């Protein structure tokens, strides 16, 4: 009798729980979760089109299902963002999917559609996944055609493609003769696509605006420029914070490649701007040859990520299109570096070559340092030497500056660098004052600290 009462109680609780659960909760779809076994035996292509909006931010609806109820959430008057992942050698869902969906919905009430083609991307044979890219593009075209028939416009379509997903975006764009609004390619896949003609890969003609981020050009990514603007963080290789040896396991292979996604997500947070400097090469950027962005006035230098389309009008008008932008990042989110130009006018009679370390100190005691040690600088009498300094912290009010000069040599005499004028020019925040210091001597390997003063107008 007591046992019967116990089971009846459990049944009652179960009924109450089921009554309290909404219909929508029972119909939520999730990203396909596979494993290495699936990768070994292979998976046939099956695509879910997982829709998220502010009405269903935590409960995806699959628009690729027959008689899907998800279309009740699809408002074609909104902008639609497609997020398309790439090759999945182990079958696990991308770890960044939930974060990027949330960040998009925080910004605006988009239709966010996660293109889950994990069944098709999960395989140990990369070329099989690459062969499925056009099939995925065909499926996306059917959905977009459906949306257009309900009143959507191609202008409102924005595709964010990662690795192979970048080329899928390009294939979709080609089907509409480049009329879709925008494509962002996040480290487009290189293997099987490098050297291919435009019709077989992502190209700037695939959308009204195409911006691309390259973070693994010496590995899994595509090296050459593909968009109206191509960003090369840290030169497109060896991202800070990523493992340098194979002993780190799978992270060694995927960290650089994935960094493009995390840089993009950082741009959605709007903590700071990842400013790119248009330049011919990474070396030219490093030695300070590319800090002039007058061609974009009244705008500043372009920024990577979601807000890159603010520079669209300037970039698409170039003939031929194609701008490369370089910059360095920090190792961790939000990844920003804060750039300054450091100008030296010296009056030493002999030419000196060496390296500079500069520290900035704020009124509240914070300190940030930049070591300009990748390329030696040449200091000639009465000739200005300009160096690009990059700092991890953004110090608003600089109270003190310290500078160290070294030749890098451990033998021989110690040198002096006689400085007629040193000037610190902010590049990331160009509205801040330019600071100077006049007539001082740097002794090799001896740190010199001083209080900067506003530059004289004649020296700006």
From Swiss-Prot:
EC numbers for this chain: 3.1.1.-
| MF (Gene Ontology) | carboxylic ester hydrolase activity; phospholipase activity
Q: Which cysteines are joined by disulfide bonds?
A: 242-255, 279-290, 293-301, 436-455
Question: EC top class, in one word?
Answer: hydrolase
What catalytic activity is recorded? 1-hexadecanoyl-2-(9Z-octadecenoyl)-sn-glycero-3-phosphate + H2O = 2-(9Z-octadecenoyl)-sn-glycero-3-phosphate + hexadecanoate + H(+)
The answer to whether keyword Cell membrane applies is: yes
GO BP annotations listed: lipid catabolic process
A Pfam family recorded for this sequence: Lipase
Q: How does it sit in the membrane?
A: Peripheral membrane protein
* Keywords, sorted A to Z: Cell membrane, Disulfide bond, Glycoprotein, Hydrolase, Lipid degradation, Lipid metabolism, Membrane, Secreted, Signal
Electron transport recorded as keyword: no
A GO CC term attached to the entry = plasma membrane
Q: Which residues form the signal peptide?
A: 1-26
Recorded hits in Gene3D superfamilies, A to Z, give:
alpha/beta hydrolase
Q: Which InterPro entries match?
A: AB_hydrolase_fold, Lipase, Lipase_LIPH, Lipase_N, TAG_lipase
Q: Where in the cell is it found?
A: Secreted; Cell membrane
Catalytic residues (UniProt): 163 (nucleophile), 187 (charge relay system), 257 (charge relay system)
Q: Where does the UniProt entry place glycosylation sites?
A: 67, 75, 177, 289, 366
Q: Which family does it belong to?
A: Belongs to the AB hydrolase superfamily. Lipase family.
What function does this protein fulfil? Hydrolyzes specifically phosphatidic acid (PA) to produce 2-acyl lysophosphatidic acid (LPA; a potent bioactive lipid mediator) and fatty acid. Does not hydrolyze other phospholipids, like phosphatidylserine (PS), phosphatidylcholine (PC) and phosphatidylethanolamine (PE) or triacylglycerol (TG).
> What name is this protein filed under?
Lipase member H-A
* Source organism per UniProt: Xenopus laevis (African clawed frog)
């Amino acid at each position: 009798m007591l046992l019967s009462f116990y089971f009846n109680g459990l049944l009652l609780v179960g009924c109450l729980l089921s009554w309290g659960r909404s219909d929508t909760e029972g119909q939520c779809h999730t990203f396909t979760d596979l494993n290495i076994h699936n990768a070994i035996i292979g998976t046939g292509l099956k695509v879910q089109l997982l829709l998220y909006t502010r009405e269903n931010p935590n409960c995806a609806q699959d628009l690729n299902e027959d008689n899907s109820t998800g279309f009740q959430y699809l408002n074609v008057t909104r902008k639609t963002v497609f997020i398309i992942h790439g090759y999945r050698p182990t079958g696990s869902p991308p770890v960044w999917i939930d974060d990027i969906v949330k960040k998009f919905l925080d910004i605006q009430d988009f239709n966010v559609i996660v293109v889950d083609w994990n069944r098709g991307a999960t395989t140990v044979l990369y070329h099989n996944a690459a062969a499925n890219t056009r099939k995925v593009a065909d499926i996306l075209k059917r959905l977009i055609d459906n949306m257009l028939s309900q009143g959507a416009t191609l202008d409102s379509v924005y595709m964010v493609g990662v690795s192979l997903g970048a080329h899928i975006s390009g294939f979709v764009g080609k089907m509409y003769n480049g009329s879709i609004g925008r494509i962002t390619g996040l480290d487009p896949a290189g293997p099987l696509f490098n050297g291919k003609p435009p019709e077989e890969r992502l190209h700037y003609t695939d959308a009204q605006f195409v911006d691309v981020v390259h973070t693994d050009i010496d590995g899994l990514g595509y090296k050459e420029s593909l968009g109206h603007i191509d960003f090369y963080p840290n030169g497109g290789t060896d991202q800070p914070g990523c493992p340098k040896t194979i002993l780190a396991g799978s992270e060694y292979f995927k960290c650089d490649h994935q960094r493009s996604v995390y840089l993009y997500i950082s741009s959605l947070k709007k903590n700071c701007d990842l400013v790119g400097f248009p330049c011919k090469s990474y070396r030219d950027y490093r030695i300070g040859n590319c800090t002039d962005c007058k061609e974009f006035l009244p705008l500043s230098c372009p920024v990577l990520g979601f807000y890159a389309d603010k520079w669209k009008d300037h970039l698409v008008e170039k003939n031929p299109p194609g701008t490369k932008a370089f910059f360095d990042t920090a190792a961790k989110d939000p990844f920003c570096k804060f750039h300054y130009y450091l100008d030296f006018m010296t009056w030493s009679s002999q030419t000196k070559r060496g390296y500079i370390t500069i520290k900035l100190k704020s009124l509240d005691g914070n300190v940030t340092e930049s070591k300009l040690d990748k390329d030696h600088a040449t200091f000639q009498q009465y000739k200005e030497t300009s160096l690009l300094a990059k700092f991890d912290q953004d110090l608003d009010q600089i109270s003190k500056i310290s500078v160290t000069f070294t030749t890098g040599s451990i033998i021989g005499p110690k040198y002096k660098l006689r400085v007629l004028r040193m000037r610190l020019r902010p590049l990331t925040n160009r509205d801040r004052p330019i600071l100077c210091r006049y007539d001082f001597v740097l002794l090799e390997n001896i740190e010199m600290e001083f209080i900067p003063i506003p530059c004289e107008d004649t020296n700006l």
